[in-house]
Amino acid sequence: MTVLISPSTLAESIHAGKKQTVLAAFWAPIEGAGRTVFCSEHIPTSIFCDPALELSGVPSSEDGRNPLPPLNVLARSFRTWGLNTDREIVFYDQGRGLFAARAWWILRWAGMPNVRILDGGFQKWEDHELGHAGGPGNFPHFCNVRPNPGQLSVATIEDVKAHQGILIDSRDEQRFAGRSEKLDLKAGHIPGAININAKSLLEDDFTFKSPEEIRQIFADKGVTSGENVIVYSGSGNHSSQLLAGMEHAGLTGASHYFAGWSQWSANPENPIEA
């Protein structure tokens, strides 16, 4: 199953009436504002997804800033979205791709195999002038599936401490180097980690680079496979995007330290490099 779907291919499948569920993961810093943006304009046939409420658990120093959602929350979201085993799922966001990638990874982890990311998001859809709709969005279909977690590898903090392979920090270079940190308690990175900024896998329009280009980016850092690799970010967003890029490039098998730097840096006993 390919990770990405282009705006033109999605438009063709919508017009052809293909069985699929299109979900808009629209986030906004003010509660409820994401739904307001969605209701003003979205891709036809879309259903709204609230990343803060449906793709995250309760933040804590023990679990991280945006931990994985509890299974009861995810099961409720599956029903709200009307997920079905015979329907492909397509996620998109406003354009940067972080929340669509987060959704893609969480649903794959929860046992949904046919999940794709709209390459370039809603902004790329608009650039192609493919049309949009307003209002509350599509009515969900009957849901016939429940979350089945564990289908992708999750690394715990203990796994990271014991890891002898490659550890990748997917945040930007300033945060990795400890020169800037606006989101978490401390600046820096986990000792031994290398830095591959998730944004480096994207073109200027936030579409993914070609598989060949992405493989070269990883090869330049000594990474030629996803095996024995753990990826992290602050709280699961950039790391999900990096993992999507790795799968797009055929570098499969990496584990996801989802709690990431927000969990690691909250414990004063954990070592830090900067």
Residue ranges and their predicted role:
Residues 1-274:
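Cytosolic catalytic domains that perform sulfur/thiol-centered chemistry
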